[in-house]
Amino acid sequence: MAAVQFAAAGVLTGLLALATLASCNTDGDILYKQRLAWEDPNNVLQSWDPTLANPCTWFHVTCNLNNSVIRVDLGKAGISGPLLPDLGALESLQYMELFGNSLNGSIPSTLGNLTDLISLDLWDNLLTGPIPTTLGSISTLRYLRLYENNLTGPIPPSFGNLTSLLELKLHRNSLSGSIPASLGNIKSLQFLKLNENMLTGTVPLEVLSLVVVGNLTELNIARNNLDGTVRSSGLRVTAVIQDMRIA
């Protein structure tokens, strides 16, 4: 009986090892496919070799102890091209740092599947189209920075579900519609920058109340098409409201 149990334990250990290896290879396959979709004039992705056992030895990639990818650091790397929907299958990814490049096309809705994601930095690119509502399902997200792109459409009300968020920076896009009152649910929010868009309507009281009941220290909604009245006496917030009537 002991021998049978020992053999069973060995089989289980082997299966777990194979599962971990398969996961690593999956991450590598995804990233290599993304590499092929990008232009890389500076050869920063030269080390992304699909023949290796896993991507953990690649430059600009960080893995956890299980050899799963948790971080991709390609800020200001000179790359261009689209973001593939396959990126949403990087199950352990915590940091996606792709700012300051020439990425184009839309933000894949599949990024909402990255349930461990802490930071999504896609600022200063050439991204177009709407912001996926699915990003509002990433409860672990603390930094969402999509500013200085060409994004259009509304701010997803689903962002009100991001109750761990510290920074929401969507400025210098072409976003339209109203500011969702649901953003007032994010009591952890410290920085909210929505300036230089095409937002309309009034600033919801739920959002303004974050100054009192939350941790908001910077609110920038300048250079939109907002209207209404804002009163801010004794508030801790730096409110830059150039295009609003202030009573």
Swiss-Prot record:
It comes from the Eukaryota. Transmembrane segments: none annotated. One of its GO terms (cellular component) is external side of plasma membrane. Residues 1-24 form the signal peptide. Glycans are attached at N66, N104, N113, N150, N161, N215. InterPro entries: LRR_dom_sf (IPR032675), LRR_N_plant-typ (IPR013210), LRR_R13L4/SHOC2-like (IPR055414). The keyword Repeat applies. This is Disease resistance protein BAK6. It comes from Zea mays. The gene is BAK6.
